[in-house]
Amino acid sequence: CVQHLLGDFAFAIWDNSAQKLFCARDHMGIKPFYYTLTDTLFAFASEIKGLLVLPIDRGGINEDRIADYLTCIATENESTFYNNILRLPPGHFLEINTGKSLLYKYWEPQPAQISGSSKFAYEEQFYSIFKEATRCRLRSNFPVGSFLSGGIDSSSIVCMSAGPLRHQLPDQMHTFSGIFNEISICDERQFFQSVLNRYEVIPHFICADRINPSVAYDRTIQLEDEPFWAPHIFMGWELMAIAKQQGIRILLDGHDGDSAVSHGLGLFPELLFQGKWFRLLKECYLIGNTPSLKRTLKNLFRVCWNCTLYRASALIPVTFQPNHFVKTLSRLNPSFEKRNSIRSRLLKAETDRPNDGQREYEHHMSVITQPLHPLALEVLERQCIQHGLIGCYPFFDKRLIEFCLALPAEQKRSNGFNRNIVRKSLQSILPNRIAERKSKTNFTPNMTHIFSTTGKAWLQFNVDKTPQQTYFYLNKEELFNIYDSFQREPSKTSLMDLGFLLRSISLSQWLTNQ
């Protein structure tokens, strides 16, 4: 039956006649499912802490998971930080009966059957699928809310909900946005204001560059049963708190619509391999907001280089080490690195990651099936639960994902615009300011600002009190070098460096509680 289900779910059903337990998790892993299985016991829970209270053997700490966490890769989505506690992977079901268990993948993305091949047929079908994916997530007896950032994903959701679907809402829609008065480079008011001007919604704002992140981080560390990934959780945390105050139960989120729809990067290799040089030059020229001959040639060289490397990698195993991996390895305790073959794990991750030399279908499949997706969704799920909210993600509807997988590359990227199908399909409801936006906001400047002002004392306290057991995994000297560099010039600190500091703190807190 699970093959016929839609939506977000994790459940277990006892089949008395067959004397077996049937467990399943939704397609993208939005709802979590953890379990432990021994010769004499099977136990499951929606949170790891539900298993930790049982008299079970946790199996010790999973050092491979720590290695992946500290090097910021995700190589699979079944293990946890405990050797004897597992995740039920997305799109899988598990059958348990006397003496045996069966883990089965019931779903992986498959291209949908699309009727018609004209751009108008594609646009009509996307509009219909996206409308339905949004509509079926609006069912509530309480006010419905949505994040609104000014990007095309959240804006599309708000415009569809407050526009064509407004009669499906139980009350006027609420939106939740961050504004940046001090770090203006992160401010998106010029974009999301066009949505607020067009639709009747109740907007709510926070000054995201004045937040003290310590509350969100300390509470999340308490909530999470593992070290967590999300570096920018504090803005979402504060917005969820406002949503709770407004009586919201359903909170819509455009989380990672990029992966669901695809930026269409596979168009470049396809044009190159097909010898369509004029179209390739045109698309290279139109990348970004300031086209130039120099930039065009640079983009063209990058396309040719990526395609050459990708073709070569099929014949020659990847053995080189990208600079960011070499830098990451230097931050680990050398003995930890050696006993867990971390270099090999990094090289495998480099081989398996989405490659810009892939054709569009391969690239899109590689992006949408990354193991990182359910890890991020699990953090969001617990954040929502803490605030009495149900997080809903229309772009992660399986019907929409499979439709986008089937689209030709030129429907995803055209004339310099990525996610072209969204822009064209929803042009009747999207403000031009949104539909014609090419840029994507980088929130790193606000991260460095926050942790050098309101969060400075919190960061210093937690780095200084890093427990000794953390250095079984980290290079202490490197940790403090990064921290000292951040203190001297926070604005020049990369997200990679600041993220490493925050992951170190999360790992330290988790190790202390073991």
Question: What do the PLM-derived regions correspond to, one by one?
Answer:
Residues 1-225, 236, 428, 433, ...:
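Cysteine-centered catalytic environments shared across enzyme families
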Residues 27, 238-305, 376-400:
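Active-site adenylate/phosphate-handling loop in enzymes that bind or generate adenylated species
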Residues 53, 83-90, 100, 201, ...:
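Adenosyl-5′-phosphate
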Residues 61, 80, 121, 125, ...:
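Generic recognition of stable, solvent-exposed alpha-helical segments in well-folded globular domains
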